[in-house]
Amino acid sequence: DSEFAELKIRGKIFKLPILKASIGEDVIDISRVSAEADCFTYDPGFMSTASCQSTITYIDGDKGILRHRGYDIKDLAEKSDFLEVAYLLIYGELPSGEQYNNFTKQVAHHSLVNERLHYLFQTFCSSSHPMAIMLAAVGSLSAFYPDLLNFKEADYELTAIRMIAKIPTIAAMSYKYSIGQPFIYPDNSLDFTENFLHMMFATPCTKYKVNPIIKNALNKIFILHADHEQNASTSTVRIAGSSGANPFACISTGIASLWGPAHGGANEVVINMLKEIGSSEYIPKYIAKAKDKNDPFRLMGFGHRIYKNYDPRAAVLKETCKEVLKELGQLDNNPLLQIAIELEAIALKDEYFIERKLYPNVDFYSGIIYKAMGIPSQMFTVLFAIARTVGWMAQWKEMHEDPEQKISRPR
């Protein structure tokens, strides 16, 4: 039987359908409130508003649970590779061996970008941030695929594959241009993560030998960042897509949203904070500053809009961080890691943080891993974009396949 919630406005009662969720909280359908009650609902930041129906990702923030298509994020990070998870998000199921091989071949086939794109890079000054270059380059792909300006359902999967394939190439090109080195072409004999590292660190005169520990760590990071419900950048992609904008334009809007320091740029801010703290002996001083309402200092890498428990992604990254630093001989002498571990230990025992349910989030350890890998801080958000493109494309595809999809237009 249908359930309803009752809303009383100026003495009149309105029955609002309660929509049953397959998992998690049920939802009150308020779509007819404005027409029937002559009122709008007000929810700044969409704190209590579901903007769409989705079967891609589920989060229980109180319990620290994150699942993609029903699979726990920790299992995916430990047992899958990134393109398996990409397939899962886009198609709804993990691939068979044959499906996986076909999918990876398609991604490899589409990894090259048009040579004319090189001219676009040359219009940027040498000091340009790689995110600025990437944002422009991804948007410009619309010019190379004019057929997708009026895309059809048959294009959804091929478009997703093209985007997943080309984003790492553009990301590496953005980095190479920013440091004045020649672009490195993709090598289809390498897997997805190896290929990206190759394009980042090889030069025409020097081959880059991929360390398997580094590769596996980056693979986990990509998986952990692949999708995360209707966050700011994903919602931006959906809103842009709801107007019928071409997929390259939609993804470029997601990149723009991700660039913000409150979203994808947070791990770079964490690194800067750890550097500012400087030494474990100063941690109590900065803990006190974080508690002081009159002090602008914020303890970055703690707390999350959704999670009121330990972020499951942070738990995986903490162990991954130790594995990488051990492999590189930095486990006992990396000052940023030592500060981070002690800062976490102190904060988790402090009543101020316990009462407010402020736990380490995914940004707390990822930057330390990147720095150890030799990835500069201005590339952190670029790597986030590589991973999140998979989620953006899965969400974009799901939106266009939804018969109830409408153009987004908040009041």
UniProtKB/Swiss-Prot annotation:
Keyword terms: Transferase, Tricarboxylic acid cycle
Known EC number: 2.3.3.16
Something else known: Citrate synthase is found in nearly all cells capable of oxidative metabolism.
Gene of this entry: gltA
Pfam families, alphabetized: Citrate_synt
Keyword Magnesium attached: no
Protein name: Citrate synthase
Active site (catalytic residues): 304, 363
Superkingdom, natural source: Bacteria
A GO CC annotation given for this chain: cytoplasm
Catalysed reactions listed for this entry: oxaloacetate + acetyl-CoA + H2O = citrate + CoA + H(+)
InterPro entries: Citrate_synth-like_lrg_a-sub, Citrate_synth-like_sm_a-sub, Citrate_synthase, Citrate_synthase_AS, Citrate_synthase_bac-typ, Citrate_synthase_sf, Citrate_synthase_typ-I
Gene Ontology molecular function terms on file: citrate (Si)-synthase activity
Family per record: Belongs to the citrate synthase family.
GO-annotated biological processes: tricarboxylic acid cycle
Gene3D superfamilies given in the database record: 2.20.28.60, Citrate Synthase, domain 1, Cytochrome P450-Terp, domain 2
Pathway connected to this protein: Carbohydrate metabolism; tricarboxylic acid cycle; isocitrate from oxaloacetate: step 1/2
Organism phylogeny: Bacteria, Pseudomonadati, Pseudomonadota, Alphaproteobacteria, Rickettsiales
KW DNA repair (keyword) present: no
